[in-house]
Amino acid sequence: MSTTRGVSSSSAAAALALLLLFALCFFSFHFAAAARAVPRDEHQENGGVKAVAAVAADQLVLQLEGDTGNGDEVSELMGAAEEEAAACEEGKNNDECVQRRLLSDAHLDYIYTQHKNKP
């Protein structure tokens, strides 16, 4: 009867050792993945090139300085904003205009209050 007790204790020890091995592997991979490099700031990656942001139709459109373009994209965005402003001044879709203005103001506040130097 002592042999059955010895076999069960050795299998329990083997199971415990296997469990510890799996736990060790899991945590080593977890910490290796968590130890990745911190991404650099946008200004450092772009070589100091600043981005000009414009909000149009509830979307953020970025145009980098030095991009090749004829300027029609910006004038189209400005024209769309002017048309929406004219429609709002006429009193059409007043609730929609107020909601659009609040959303664009909140979006601009978010853009300008981000902490660029902190990861």
Curated annotation (Swiss-Prot):
One of its GO terms (molecular function) is growth factor activity. Residues 1-34 form the signal peptide. The modification Sulfotyrosine is found at residues 110, 112. Sulfation is important for activity and for the binding to a putative membrane receptor. PSK-alpha is produced by endopeptidase digestion. PSK-beta is produced from PSK-alpha by exopeptidase digestion. It is found in: Secreted. It comes from the Eukaryota. Promotes plant cell differentiation, organogenesis and somatic embryogenesis as well as cell proliferation. Belongs to the phytosulfokine family. This is Phytosulfokines 2. It comes from Oryza sativa subsp. japonica (Rice). The gene is PSK2.
